[in-house]
UniProtKB/Swiss-Prot annotation:
Signal peptide per UniProt: none
Gene that encodes the chain: MCTP7
GO cellular component: endosome membrane; vesicle
Membrane-crossing residue ranges in chain numbering: 812-832, 846-866, 954-974
Molecular functions (GO terms): glycosyltransferase activity; metal ion binding; oxidoreductase activity
Biased composition regions of type Polar residues, renumbered to the chain: 178-195
Protein name: Multiple C2 domain and transmembrane region protein 7
Entry comment describing in which tissues the protein is expressed: Accumulates specifically in hydathodes. Restricted the basal meristem of roots. Observed in flowers.
Membrane topology designation: Multi-pass membrane protein
Length: 1011
């Protein structure tokens, strides 16, 4: 057997800020690499704490199937030439799950790790680790030694022998965004080696590869839905808008209290979050030797599949006796009223289609097939005429009964999603379910430094030049700079958003502002993005000079006279250490950086079952009655899912299940319901019906949440309930320790804190990211249109709304309500409203003053007990949109009209003037509050500023006296006296302000300096 060509490449770039080990403040550093029993080492860099190697090494991978379980270890040492010994400088360990292909690899600087408790290490090691399968590359074992740098005491690279009796299979690296595909369970055509690998590591992947099995389901009446109310009275809302807990019968059994009651303990199913639905599948593959039907000597065949009143039609071919369709039709068994399936071959004609032949099946004899059973092999069937006699021509078909777990489900034509009038392939395409993968987004940073040897068209004046950078439809410009020496300096940064694969070019144009409104192009350069360097941290990118090309052809003699060409100095890189925000930061579903090597292992699996919808409002009129053609869209991370469109149905049943990998619990799943606008006239927009958000950190792991979610939408006339969506959600944890560790990590990648963006930059980049995702998903089939992407991504969440401002104010008041309640309680204590309570507080206060070491233990013990007590009343349901918190119940109609106004406004001037005056009134109150806060702060500053010499003198003298008193008097006595004085009896109080308050209010502020 031949060995696999798969190799692990390691580029040792350099190290930074190493620990000195030679006693003279330096180190003789080198690096040893260990992987899969192989060992390589770099050259020795003498007397250098920041060595640079730029050396590449390649390791043979003996068994690619075990790649994820191997580790790469890089150990740095300092060589002592006097003793032929070595000192440990630090190590870096990388797991096999972080290895990526060469195209995705970037240079990462890893902090040095200790080998033991007493190891003294510091600094970073720069590595670039990747996987390649180029056969021309050889292992570095034979060529890695450097005789001039090796010392006899140092070990050389070891040659590793590989057994040739073991079969090696090449494995493509898995894409984490594709490990859980919608409704495509593993078929029997997978390689035996992969099956063996799954068997060997079943305990690590039991969440990913469950088995399919058919089990019977009783049609018992479902339990009545149970209303779920919030535990807070302040956030209570109408019962019609509340969440309803349900106990449906799903594929795995009945759900009661978030747990599944299995009827058959041995029965398991991947699709256990939806009701099992049975379909009659008909795969029309091809036909042969069809009889001639036209006078032209040919036939224009198409196939019509009929079950009772349901009919599916394939596309037709012109003049072909051996057509191939390979189309699948799915008929919902619960709606079938016939017992016979007819597959009819017809000849397309202008007036009336001609009858060619048919094949008839008894549905009771159709076999049942559920994955992981092998796909049913199609067979040839002889056509019959209307009399039942065999005729010339055969049709290849496969007919079986399956569930929504079948591989053919997503691409099939569905009877419950069929148009009553138009059943063309184009219409059928926009009705199917689909899984989309959004492109991986990157930030492109362009640093425009300077330009030299600029040659303007008018040499009688100094050019006033600026640089225009363009990437797709994103355009940015530098400030104008007057080039007095035929050179200009800007040193400005631009940021763009780009999606993989990098097909666009970065275009930089140097333009001369000849006159106001008139610019002339001086030079231009094109930079392909696939040649731009990627970086995952903030290390410096080397700047490069790029030649500027003239936009027009000039005189050849002039080109010969010009000795130098125009150049521009740029620093361009792809930022992989950031997460490109393409959705609202409050509802982010993915927080991973762009660079794949920085991704951590998934901590869990999110499963979503979209069951059905009830009580939907009609969104259109068809044949004189209201109806809807609805579908659902789910978004989490880079994976978008779309259910099939249920045509002409106000209570549709979807029963489709989807799965996502979870990398961070502080993320949000978003599910939207839409009305398909592509079934009528072209150019119609898909209409939004409602949206649901579920934050994963609020879910208990392993629990199945089955609820009916109200679809609440805010209209210009007020909040409306558009129906209810019944869903089942389960969050399964793979590694509980990793999930808890995730709570200690920053929410966003490191670069967001090292080199943060401004708020304006974030809004602009987010807008560009949404446009890129919408353009990419809009090219899929069926497309996810732009209005869907914008609605799911909350692109308008930053726009002004009086309703949202009120809601945020009351939210803030709710947050501080506890502090206000404590202040009110303490005021009652000080006023001796309840003497017994006040005396007890005095005793407790005296105990804490005498024993201050009990303050922190008492406080934390109190919070511990309160937390245990509240566990009994913990929420048992996912949070949902609350109309009372959103201030959507009693909102003024004019405020709603303002919220739905476009940007810029399209309302009449009188309405805009009225709203402007109202906004001025609100802003005036805010201005007053901010001014009062500033005044209090300036009075504190005036205590020691001698702005009021008498007040400052009094304060300084009091501070000196207080210092003497606090030095002489024990602090317990001072605190006790202050506490007793604060809680003194009302008989010893008066209503006038105290002396310190009077003194503070007399201090000057800068209000006198305001215009």
């Amino acid at each position: 057997m031949m060995m696999s060509n798969l190799k692990l490449g390691v580029d040792v770039i350099g190290a930074h800020n190493l620990f000195p080990k030679d006693g003279q403040g330096t180190s003789n550093a080198y690096v040893e690499l260990y992987f899969d029993g192989q060992k390589h080492r770099t050259t020795i860099k003498d007397r250098d704490l920041n060595p640079v190697w730029n050396e590449s090494f390649f390791f043979n991978i003996s068994d690619p199937s075990r790649l994820h379980y191997l580790n790469l270890e890089a150990q740095a040492y300092s060589h002592n030439r006097s003793t032929n010994g070595r000192s440990f400088l630090g190590k870096v360990s990388l797991s096999g799950t972080s290895f990526v292909p060469h195209s995705d690899a970037v240079v990462l600087h890893f902090p040095m790790e200790r080998r033991g408790i007493f190891s003294r290490v510091r600094g970073e090691l720069g590595l670039k680790v990747y996987i390649t399968d180029e056969a021309s590359l050889k292992s570095s074992a034979a060529s890695n030694d450097h005789p001039d740098n090796l010392d006899p005491a140092l070990p050389r690279a070891m040659n590793v022998e590989h057994r040739s009796d073991k079969r090696h299979v090449f494995y493509n690296l898995p894409n984490s965004a594709q490990e859980h595909q919608h409704q495509h369970p593993q078929g029997p055509n997978q390689s035996s080696s992969l099956a063996a690998e799954q068997d060997n590591h079943n305990e690590h992947h039991h969440h990913y590869v469950p088995k399919h099995q058919v089990d019977e389901m009783r049609s018992e009446p479902a339990r009545p839905s149970k209303l779920v109310h919030a535990h807070s009275i302040a956030s209570a809302q109408p019962a019609d808008f509340a969440l309803k807990e349900t106990s449906p019968h799903l594929g795995g059994g009945r759900v009661v209290g978030g747990r599944v009651i299995h009827k058959d303990k041995t029965a398991t199913s991947t699709y256990d979050l939806v009701e099992r639905m049975y379909f009659l599948y008909v795969r029309v593959v091809k036909a042969r030797e069809l009889p001639i039907m036209d006078i032209t000597g040919s036939v224009d065949p198409f196939v019509e599949v009929r079950v009772g009143n349901y009919k599916g039609i394939t596309r037709h071919f012109e003049k072909r006796q051996h057509p191939e369709w390979n189309q699948v039709f799915a008929f919902a068994k619960e709606r079938m009223q016939a017992s016979v399936l007819e597959v009819v071959v017809k000849d397309k004609d202008l007036l009336k289609d001609d009858y060619v032949g048919f094949v008839r099946f008894d549905i009771n004899d159709v076999p049942l097939r559920v994955p992981p059973d092998s796909p049913l092999a199609p067979q040839w069937y002889r056509l019959e005429d209307k009399k039942g006699e065999k005729i010339k021509g055969e049709l290849m078909l496969a007919v079986w009964i399956g569930t929504q777990a079948d591989e053919a489900f997503s691409d099939a034509w569905h009877s419950d999603a069929a148009m009553p009038v138009d059943c063309s392939p184009a219409i059928s395409a926009v009705l199917r379910s689909k899984v989309y993968h959004a492109p991986r987004l990157w930030y492109v940073r362009v640093n425009v430094i300077e330009a030299q040897d600029l040659i303007p068209t008018d040499k009688t004046r100094f050019p006033d030049v600026y640089v225009k950078a363009q990437l797709g439809n994103q355009v940015m410009k530098t400030r104008p700079c007057q080039a007095r020496t035929l050179g200009a300096v800007w040193n400005e940064d631009f940021l763009f958003v780009v999606a993989e694969p990098f097909e666009d070019h970065l275009v930089l144009t140097v333009e001369d502002r000849v006159a106001p409104g008139k610019d002339e192009i001086v030079g231009r350069t094109y930079i392909p993005l696939n040649t731009v360097e990627k970086r995952a941290d903030d290390h410096m990118i080397h700047a490069r000079w790029y030649n500027l090309e003239r936009p027009v052809i000039v005189d050849v003699d002039q080109l010969k006279r010009e000795k130098f060409s125009m150049r521009i100095h740029l620093r361009v890189c792809l930022e992989g250490g950031y997460h490109v925000l393409d959705e609202s930061t409050h509802y982010s579903s993915d927080l991973r950086p762009s660079a794949r090597p920085l991704w951590r292992q998934p901590i869990g699996v999110l499963e979503l079952g979209i069951l059905n919808a009830v009580g939907l409002h009609p969104m259109k009129t068809r044949e004189g009655r209201g109806t809807s053609d609805t579908f659902c869209v789910g978004k989490y991370g880079q994976k978008w899912v779309r259910t099939r469109t249920m045509v002409d149905n106000l209570c549709p049943k979807y029963n489709e299940q989807y799965t996502w990998e979870v990398f961070d619990p502080a993320t949000v799943l978003t599910v939207g319901v839409f009305d398909n606008g592509q079934l009528g006239e072209k150019g119609n927009r898909d209409v939004k019906i409602g949206k649901i958000r579920i934050r994963l950190s609020t879910l208990e792991t392993g629990r199945i949440y089955t609820h009916s979610y109200p679809l609440l939408v805010l209209h210009p006339t007020g909040v409306k309930k558009m129906g209810e969506l019944h869903m089942a959600v389960r969050f399964t944890c793979i590694s509980f320790a990793n999930m808890l560790y995730q709570y200690s990590k920053p929410l966003l990648p490191k670069m967001h804190y090292v080199r943060p963006f401004s708020v304006m930059q974030q809004d602009m980049l987010r807008h560009q990211a949404v446009n890129i995702v919408a353009a990419r998903l809009g090219r899929a089939e069926p497309p996810l249109r732009k209005e869907i992407i914008e609605f799911m991504s909350d692109t308008d969440s930053h726009l002004w709304s009086m309703r949202k401002s009120k809601a945020n104010f009351f939210r803030m008041m709710t947050v501080f309500s506890g502090v206000i309640a404590v202040g009110k309680w303490f005021s009652d204590i000080c006023s001796w409203r309840n003497p017994i309570t006040t005396v007890l507080v005095h005793v407790l206060f005296l105990m804490l003053v005498c024993l201050p070491e009990l303050i922190l233990p008492t406080m934390f013990l109190y919070m511990f007990l309160i937390g245990l007590w509240n566990y009994r009343f913990r929420p048992r349901y996912p949070p949902h949109m609350n109309t009372k918190i959103s201030q959507a119940e009693a909102v003024h109609p004019d405020e709603l009209d303002e919220e739905f106004d476009t940007f810029p406004t399209t309302r009449n001037p009188d309405m805009v003037r009225l709203r402007y005056d109202r906004l001025r009134s609100v802003a005036g109150r805010i201005q007053t509050v901010i001014g009062d806060l500033a005044t209090q702060g300036e009075r504190f500053q005036a205590l020691l500023s001698w702005r009021d010499p008498r007040a400052t003198a009094i304060f300084v003298i009091l501070c000196f006296i207080a210092a003497i008193v606090f030095f002489i008097t024990p602090i317990q006595i001072v605190v006790a006296l202050a506490g007793f004085f604060t809680m003194r009896h009302p008989r010893f109080r008066h209503r006038l302000p105290s002396v310190p308050v009077n003194f503070f209010r007399r201090l000057p502020a800068r209000t006198d300096s305001m215009l």
